[in-house]
């Protein structure tokens, strides 16, 4: 017998069936109905019931459990299955316990998916049975359901596996992360060394211009009043701490500590120190304060500030994750941090005790990144020292792993490699210091980049102004690297020494809790302060307000649509070569319908999984609907819309665009590498839908002039963009998709990372995408407002049936 699971939104489902003359029992329990402190969540699509539960002990193993007592009607030998979520970047193992007996640890796998795993078998009596779920590893363990079954050979995965093309392992040809990494590497290999000074000078201008664009600083922001204010001052034996708040943009406040040495001549040389990803401590992180005070001991005035999302700016509306929202308007996290640094230099230059011709910049990790990107565009910097960042894009993308979105500038790999960015500094002094055991920025890439940059410095006779230092240590601003900063900056800004490391004196930093280290004495921004997210939203609204209206006259409207479509393609990285191919991986029967597993080729070396469901008794050529769902293509099994389409004789192609559903990969890693590539993941996914439509049109059993798309949830953005970019879809309907990308701008992010396409709002918002579908049927069903009745359940079905009638 095929005992496929059927589930509802209820607390549990009890099924009993007769097997070989004996009663067998199946008890399905939803973990969200267990008792315990694990957090109830719904943010990962594909769960059963009404949600799932997540342990919050990360990065420790929780000592709290989820517990439920249920009742078995029949005694017998029971298999205990656990359904939970696994992912490649997190250790999420669980352990089930039944009536005090702990079973095998499950979900050690590192593949991104919901999956049933067998925990063990045991003999159970009829009556009460207690089930306990334990955390068994250091990730965010996410438990969905428990199944106790005494049915012989019962496998809850058997039915699910039919709907999977890759039940055991995601192959390389379906791995969107691999695809984006390889595409990035192909671009980095195109960068060549300049053969002459003349060649470099010609290239230098374009590299500088493209860097400014990639950072989101083209045009330059206006240098508005800094409105600096000192909120506190504290005396120490050798220096004074000044707590300073300034505005890098109107009402956008930066919190900074200025350390002023006591004694010595003025005006002094100064150094801006930008911290790395010390999210809680920011400028006050222990290793960074040691570096700040070490520079003060050399005689520098030091300004250390909190980048967005760190230290005193670790507030709602300021997080690094909002950098995805910034991409929509053509801004970047790093561009904002670079501009904060430029304004910090403005502030230092305004002080009478600072020599504006002797200002330097340094930082580690994210601060090394800021040094790397700020120095080429800020000519007032007399010297720079970047630590634990400089690498090569090639080695960093290939071996460095996942990164914060602040490291990713849109399309930058199309225009430069890191050695060229370092070369923009020539002949000004620049030092790169790294840990040889740094897994994030492989040292081979650092050495290669600095060697290639040295050739550019040599063209200007400035080889002595460039230095690379590495130490046998992992990632971090360790003492040997801090000492390298002291010596390098002292040589070029103080005229002391030969640039070799200077021993760090014994330092006595304040306790982290000292109020003298904080600018916001009440922990709050000024009442009129604007957050990062607020600035992004305002820019989005400004861009949208400037869109030209769609012309009323048909000929002008056609020209408008053609121009806008071309601009969208250009913004999204260009239209790839057309494809309309697929390979069949077999068929199976489902409720009388025929289901064909298809791997649709959407790129020369990438495929996406799909299932073509042909209705029973179908005509020789049927219309078709491409089905997308946030929960993945398997959601077609329980979709009433799919059922209605099949009963009406319409085929359904349920597919997973790249990086989603069965093809899920580490989303931040994949989406951020797509940013570097200059082909946003949303645009790639829309291309998958376009290729699927083109493939369907080649099939003899599909009416090629009647291929529509339906999308439920956020994936409606994919369907809408696909319909806007291509006429291959004759109609489209979305249910629950955002009606504007302005809705995607918030902190925390309201949409998944794949939805944030760099620069797209400079071209068009969702209403303009829909306008490009004019003359084709388009339905956008939005979630009803509070208190409003929902739309009729069959409204979308009626729309699609009408849209797919023969013309």
Residue ranges and their predicted role:
Residues 1-5:
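N-terminal secretory signal peptides that target proteins for export/translocation
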Residues 9-18:
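Bacterial N-terminal signal peptides
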Residues 24-156:
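Extracytoplasmic
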Residues 155-254, 426-609, 613-623, 631-637, ...:
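Alpha/beta-hydrolase-fold serine-hydrolase catalytic core, especially in secreted/extracellular enzymes
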Residues 259-261, 274, 305, 362-364, ...:
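Generic beta-strand/beta-sheet core signal
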Residues 265-345, 349-350, 390-400, 620-697, ...:
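Cap/lid segment of the alpha/beta-hydrolase catalytic domain
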Residues 279-290, 325-339, 361-372, 396, ...:
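Alpha-helix capping and helix-loop boundary segments enriched in small/acidic/polar residues
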Residues 346-414, 692-763, 769:
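Primarily recognizes the serine-hydrolase "nucleophile elbow" in alpha/beta-hydrolase
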């Amino acid at each position: 017998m095929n005992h496929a699971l059927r589930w509802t939104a209820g607390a549990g489902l009890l099924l009993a069936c007769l097997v070989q003359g004996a009663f067998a029992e199946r008890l399905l329990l939803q973990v969200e109905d267990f008792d315990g402190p694990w957090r109830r969540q719904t943010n990962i699509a594909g769960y059963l019931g009404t949600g799932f539960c997540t342990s919050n002990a990360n990065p420790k193993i929780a000592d709290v459990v989820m517990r439920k007592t249920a009742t078995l009607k029949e005694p017998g030998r029971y298999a205990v299955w656990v359904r939970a979520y696994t992912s490649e970047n997190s250790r999420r193992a669980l352990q089930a316990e039944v009536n005090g007996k702990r079973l095998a640890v499950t979900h050690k796998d590192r593949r991104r998916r919901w999956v049933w795993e067998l925990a063990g078998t045991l003999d159970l009596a009829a009556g009460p049975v207690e089930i306990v779920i334990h955390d068994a590893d250091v990730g965010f363990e996410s438990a969905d359901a428990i199944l106790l079954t005494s049915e012989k050979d019962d496998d809850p995965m058997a039915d699910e596996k039919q709907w999977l093309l890759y039940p055991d392992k995601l192959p390389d040809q379906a791995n969107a992360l691999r695809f984006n990494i390889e595409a990035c590497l192909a671009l980095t290999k195109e960068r060549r060394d300049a053969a002459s000074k003349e060649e470099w000078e010609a290239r230098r201008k374009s590299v500088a211009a493209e860097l400014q664009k990639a950072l989101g600083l083209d045009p330059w922001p206006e240098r508005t009043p800094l409105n600096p204010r000192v909120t506190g001052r504290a005396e120490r034996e050798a220096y004074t701490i000044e707590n300073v708040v300034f505005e890098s943009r109107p009402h956008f406040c930066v919190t900074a500590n200025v350390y002023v040495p006591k004694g010595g001549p003025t005006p002094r040389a100064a150094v801006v120190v930008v911290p790395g990803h010390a999210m809680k401590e920011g400028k006050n992180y222990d290793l960074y304060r040691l570096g700040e005070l070490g520079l003060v001991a050399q005689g520098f005035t030091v300004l250390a500030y909190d980048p967005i999302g760190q230290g005193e700016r670790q507030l709602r509306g300021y997080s690094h994750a909002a950098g995805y929202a910034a991409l929509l308007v053509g801004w970047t996290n790093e561009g904002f941090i670079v501009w904060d640094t430029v304004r910090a230099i403005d502030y230092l230059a305004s002080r009478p005790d600072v020599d504006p011709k002797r200002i330097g910049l340094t930082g580690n990790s994210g601060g090394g990144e800021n040094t790397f990107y700020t120095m080429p565009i800020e000519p007032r910097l007399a010297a720079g020292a970047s630590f634990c960042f400089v690498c090569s894009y090639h080695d960093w993308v290939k071996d460095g792993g996942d990164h914060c979105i602040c490291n990713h500038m849109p399309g930058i790999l199309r225009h430069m490699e890191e050695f060229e960015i370092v070369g923009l500094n020539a002949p000004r002094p620049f030092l790169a210091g790294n840990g040889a055991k740094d897994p994030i920025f492989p040292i081979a890439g650092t050495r290669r980049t600095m060697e290639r940059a040295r050739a550019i410095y040599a063209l200007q006779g400035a080889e002595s102004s460039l230095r690379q230092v590495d130490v046998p240590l992992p990632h971090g601003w360790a003492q040997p690297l801090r000492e390298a900063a002291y010596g390098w900056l002292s040589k070029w800004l103080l005229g002391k020494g030969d640039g070799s490391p200077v021993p760090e004196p014994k330092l006595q930093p304040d306790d982290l809790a000292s109020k003298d280290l904080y600018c916001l004495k009440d922990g709050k921004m000024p009442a009129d302060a604007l957050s990062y997210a607020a600035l992004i939203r305002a820019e989005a609204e400004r861009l949208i307000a400037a869109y030209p209206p769609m012309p009323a006259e048909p000929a002008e409207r056609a020209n408008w649509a053609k121009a806008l479509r071309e601009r969208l393609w250009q913004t999204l990285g260009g239209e790839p070569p057309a494809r309309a191919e697929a390979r069949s991986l077999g068929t199976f029967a489902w409720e009388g319908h025929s289901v064909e597993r298809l791997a649709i080729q959407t790129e020369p070396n990438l495929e996406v999984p799909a299932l073509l469901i042909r209705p029973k008794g179908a005509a020789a050529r049927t219309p078709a609907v491409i089905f997308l769902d946030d929960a993945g293509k398997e959601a077609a099994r329980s979709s009433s819309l799919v059922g209605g389409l099949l009963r009406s004789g319409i085929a359904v192609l349920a597919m997973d665009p790249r990086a989603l559903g069965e093809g899920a990969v580490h989303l931040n890693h994949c989406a951020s590498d797509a940013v570097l590539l200059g082909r946003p993941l949303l645009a790639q996914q829309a291309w998958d839908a376009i290729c699927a439509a083109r493939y369907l049109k080649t099939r003899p059993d599909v009416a090629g002039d009647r291929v529509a798309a339906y999308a439920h949830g956020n994936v409606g953005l994919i369907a809408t963009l696909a319909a806007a970019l291509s006429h291959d879809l004759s109609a489209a309907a979305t249910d629950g998709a955002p009606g504007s990308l302005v809705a995607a701008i918030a902190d925390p992010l309201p949409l998944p990372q794949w939805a944030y396409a760099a620069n797209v709002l400079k071209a068009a918002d969702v209403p303009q995408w829909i306008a490009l579908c004019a003359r084709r049927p388009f339905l956008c069903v939005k979630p009803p407002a509070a208190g409003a009745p929902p739309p009729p359940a069959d409204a979308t079905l009626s729309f699609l049936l009408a849209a797919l009638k023969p013309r």
